[in-house]
Design a protein with these regions (language model features):
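Strand-loop microenvironment adjacent to phosphate/nucleotide-handling motifs in alpha/beta enzyme folds
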Residues: 5-9, 24-28, 175-196, 200-370
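A short helix->loop->beta-strand "cap" motif at the edges of active sites that frequently abuts
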Residues: 56-57, 147-151, 186
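Short secondary-structure boundary/capping segments
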Residues: 76, 104, 126-128, 168-173, ...
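Hydrophobic/aromatic anchor residues within beta-strands of the central parallel beta-sheet
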Residues: 87, 129, 152, 188-191, ...
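Conserved active-site region of classical short-chain dehydrogenase/reductase
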Residues: 96, 134, 138, 235
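Conserved Rossmann-fold NAD(P)-dependent oxidoreductase catalytic core, especially the SDR/UDP-sugar
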Residues: 106, 112, 116-172, 180-181
Length: 370
């Protein structure tokens, strides 16, 4: 099996075990009021279903896509009482809405899954990446802290480590925002995940579509590799990270081996491509803007220390930003409002010194002024 497994899949038997005994995950959710941002996304919707199984006091689903919110709303309605959850159509960049939701529902815990994630798309939409991923998280964390919420957990990404894409840099800024705003009253944490198998827009659905149409299957580079987990595994890791009592900071899972994308393509071809009775070729197209050959979960300044549960590691060695961080975030906000890409990139590099912007992004201001 190609998937790099971090632990046993969280299948129905595992969920039965979770529900049958006292455990930190159940304790953290049962009877509690939970706010989930990005609730209609691939990870968010799976997380919503998992949370509902653990019987929260109330679950607030915040999602900016009407279609996605309606889908998760209907899915939960098929198995859960309507008064168990509330669906809120809105954007995490809407601070007035966030304040209203926090004041009205008084959540005990926030799971922050809302994010823009597609690397090449964000390279051509840099203001959206920074506004949503960086500033959206920063403002959410400030409001959560001011409201006295006990904890906030953000789903982060391995692309935040030594980022070369603006998506990765924006998520690293989001991580630093949580480290900066962490307090004894409100625990701020993040968990870095790799690629989730089968998520929309990822290689697996793209490969399956290419195979269905007879190929070729396009891979960026023969040596490019990624870490993969199944959605059930990702959800279980998120719930475990949120349930670590008294812990804050950044967490990473116990890792298996990375998987070559060309091997994923070949496995899917062998599995599904033989049905049409002809060979399906693989072609290499070159790395896309912002893509790496391989991803990392730790920078050279970071060290991973095991947690008590054994499934996760806490990342240490992060330099928590000083008071200038808030000034830089104000600068980022102004840059987004004024659409000043040059200064925005400069500010991102001040916040994330190891960010290496792509040539495409650096050339964008010159193209715009030409």
């Amino acid at each position: 099996m190609l998937l790099a497994r971090t632990h046993e899949t969280c299948n129905s038997a595992v969920w039965s075990d979770l529900l049958a005994q006292e455990n930190p995950v159940e304790k953290a959710i049962t009877g509690e009021t939970i706010l989930l941002t990005g609730a209609g996304g691939f990870i968010g919707s799976a997380l919503a279903e998992a949370i509902v199984r653990l019987k929260p006091g109330h679950l607030i689903l915040l999602e900016h896509s009407e279609r996605n919110l309606n889908e998760i709303d209907l899915k939960l309605a098929a198995t859960s009482a309507r008064d168990l959850y509330t669906s809120v159509l809105g954007d995490i960049c809407d601070t007035k809405l966030l304040s209203e939701v926090l004041q009205r529902y008084r959540p005990d815990m926030v799971y922050h899954a809302a994010a823009f994630k597609h690397v090449p798309l964000m390279e051509t939409n840099p203001f959206a990446a920074v506004a949503n991923n960086a500033l959206g998280t920063y403002n959410l964390a400030k409001l959560v802290r001011a409201s006295g919420v006990a904890s906030l957990l953000m789903i982060s990404t391995d692309k935040a480590v030594n980022p070369i894409s603006i998506m990765g840099a924006s998520k690293r800024v989001a991580e630093l925002a949580l480290l900066n705003l962490d307090s004894p009253r409100t625990r701020m944490s993040a968990i870095r995940l790799g690629n989730v198998w089968g998520s929309p827009g990822s290689v697996v659905p793209a490969f399956l579509d290419q195979i269905f149409h007879g190929g070729p299957v396009t891979v960026t580079h023969p040596e490019v590799s990624r870490y993969f987990s199944k959605i059930e595994e990702a959800v279980e890791l998120i719930l475990l990270a949120a349930a670590l009592e008294g812990a804050s900071g950044i967490f990473i899972p116990q890792l298996g081996a990375p998987v070559k994308i060309v091997d994923v393509a070949q496995q899917l071809i062998n599995q599904d491509g033989s049905k049409n009775g002809r060979a399906i070729p693989v072609t290499f197209t070159g790395l896309r803007t912002g893509d790496k050959m391989s991803e990392e979960f730790l920078s050279k300044e970071e060290v991973a220390e095991p947690t008590v549960d054994g499934e996760l590691f806490r990342v240490t060695g992060n330099k928590i930003p000083n008071d200038s961080f808030h000034l830089h975030m104000s600068e980022l906000s102004n840059c987004v409002a004024q659409r000043d890409l040059t200064v925005m990139i400069e500010t991102l590099c001040k916040i994330v010194p190891n960010y290496r912007p792509t040539k495409l992004l650096r050339a964008a201001p010159a193209r715009a002024s030409a």
